[in-house]
Amino acid sequence: MATTAELFEEPFVADEYIERLVWRTPGGGSRGGPEAFDPKRLLEEFVNHIQELQIMDERIQRKVEKLEQQCQKEAKEFAKKVQELQKSNQVAFQHFQELDEHISYVATKVCHLGDQLEGVNTPRQRAVEAQKLMKYFNEFLDGELKSDVFTNSEKIKEAADIIQKLHLIAQELPFDRFSEVKSKIASKYHDLECQLIQEFTSAQRRGEISRMREVAAVLLHFKGYSHCVDVYIKQCQEGAYLRNDIFEDAGILCQRVNKQVGDIFSNPETVLAKLIQNVFEIKLQSFVKEQLEECRKSDAEQYLKNLYDLYTRTTNLSSKLMEFNLGTDKQTFLSKLIKSIFISYLENYIEVETGYLKSRSAMILQRYYDSKNHQKRSIGTGGIQDLKERIRQRTNLPLGPSIDTHGETFLSQEVVVNLLQETKQAFERCHRLSDPSDLPRNAFRIFTILVEFLCIEHIDYALETGLAGIPSSDSRNANLYFLDVVQQANTIFHLFDKQFNDHLMPLISSSPKLSECLQKKKEIIEQMEMKLDTGIDRTLNCMIGQMKHILAAEQKKTDFKPEDENNVLIQYTNACVKVCAYVRKQVEKIKNSMDGKNVDTVLMELGVRFHRLIYEHLQQYSYSCMGGMLAICDVAEYRKCAKDFKIPMVLHLFDTLHALCNLLVVAPDNLKQVCSGEQLANLDKNILHSFVQLRADYRSARLARHFS
């Protein structure tokens, strides 16, 4: 059995249990090989082991039954014991309730007795207190203070309490009978008050917070309590302003006081507010006045910079102080302090700002024109000048000489950046220093100054000068600088628009001034665009005029009707070469001067005029067969030049012109077929006829019959 018990090892696994049994049986395992294996011995061992297991099972079963009986017996005993405990607990709970009721009854009696005792004791205490006060009053009446409380400096707290009460009593006494004693009490009241304040001062210098708290609590009922607070505030600031930055010093001071004032005074928020008021009205106000008054009349630029910087730093300090407990309406309190410092400077701020901005802008412009040795001329306006301008635009008559600008656009990006920078700073100061109700109006005033000096005095003047510098369309070898003006004006417009959106819009976005500013901006831009359009139109006229001069000078009648038809080199003419070179140069200049759709619009207009010029130019000549081939070569080159425009409509016009030129060389019998071709079918017959009439063989070949 012992052997069987040893086989039951934890954790029990049946397979392992069989393996261990087989291994322990001689001849039952794999030791010794197949020859040593004895199945009968193994079977016998298994049978014996099963019998042992059955015996073990019976023994364990008997033991389990015995334990179950014992467990049931103990459970019955435990249940009986629990019932007994419940009964005793109920008895104890009843005793507890009785005791609680008795305690409540006794407590009620005690409270009643206490009220009775208090009713007796309070008058007695008052009587004792009154007796003491009468005793002390008699000492003042006799003129000799004998009590220890008045002579012992260590009992100053008790003396203060007594004298404060005597002082209140003395105020109720008639002056004619008790004037002397009232005077003595008042004198002692004042002496004790001074002693307490001196004690508070000494404790503050020693850093004894607990002593300061005790003295402040005693002084709270004295008239000199406010003086105690003043002393505290004054001593707090001793040695507090040692750095170069008074605003940083003030912030550190207030933060330090905020941490300790609650440990000293019963009303810390009032004391801290008084300290902050003292810092603002005395220290900061004198510093601000010193910084601003010295440059207020002599240097407007420095004055505005200092005002903006000081106001910003003051408001930043105020924002930090908002974290402290200063009472219920600390926002209003701090705003009033800031206003008290800066009100005299903010009242006329916008006048100083606009005055400085005007003078500064005028100086920037004048300095630029002086650097160019240019005296600004008066641009004529009114009826006569407008009439001349309209006549010149429509007829190109030389109504007075054009101005030679020597290639100068009189536009400077540096000047523009300086003007915008000055205006940007003005907008920033305006945002910070203007009252919210005045902000949109003040911002609009700054914007009008920007419009006056940037848009009118600089850009508009440059456009007018550029317009006056455009030569008439019949001028030869004219230098066309207006496109440079266009290029620079476009760049400046972008900068102007960016500042409008970035710096002006946030200031006026929620006010009626928004629509006013947008309208003014729209009017300015429309006015500028109209002058740009006028200048571009006249510049294009000059370009076409220059092409006319080239064609008139270089194109010969013999180009298209050579004397020797058999000795002609088929290529484009010299006039075509020079015109195409000129056109390509102008196209490149236009692309560099403009952006976006403006390039396409101007190139389309130039392309249409270029086509009209070549069309009319070809109408002036008579063409032989070989001359017609030369004309086709020229138009092919013109068409190649038109491709550089990258405008489909212009290319289509030259494609059609090229097809028309084919009418100059086509065989008479095929003429009708060509006229009805895809490219020419939609053209008016008169146009086709006019081109056919240019052929040298028009009469001899009787070509008119095709159009009858």
From Swiss-Prot:
> What is stated as this protein's family in its record?
Belongs to the SEC10 family.
Provide the protein's localization.
Answer: Cytoplasm; Midbody
Which sequence ranges form a coiled-coil region, renumbered to this chain? Answer: 40-101
Point out residues bearing the modification Phosphothreonine: 122, 395, 405
- Which keywords belong to this entry? Acetylation, Coiled coil, Cytoplasm, Exocytosis, Phosphoprotein, Protein transport, Transport
Give one GO molecular function term: small GTPase binding
What are the BP-aspect GO terms?
epithelial cell apoptotic process; establishment of planar polarity; exocytosis; Golgi to plasma membrane transport; membrane fission; mitotic cytokinesis; non-motile cilium assembly; post-Golgi vesicle-mediated transport
Spell out which residues are annotated as carrying N-acetylalanine. 2
A single GO CC term, please? midbody
Q: Which PANTHER family match?
A: EXOCYST COMPLEX COMPONENT 5, SEC10
Q: In which tissues is it expressed?
A: Ubiquitous.
* Gene this chain is encoded by: EXOC5
Residues that the record marks as modified (Phosphoserine) are 412
Q: What does this protein do?
A: Component of the exocyst complex involved in the docking of exocytic vesicles with fusion sites on the plasma membrane.
Q: What is the annotated quaternary arrangement, including any partners?
A: The exocyst complex is composed of EXOC1, EXOC2, EXOC3, EXOC4, EXOC5, EXOC6, EXOC7 and EXOC8. Interacts with EXOC3L1.
Q: What is this protein called?
A: Exocyst complex component 5
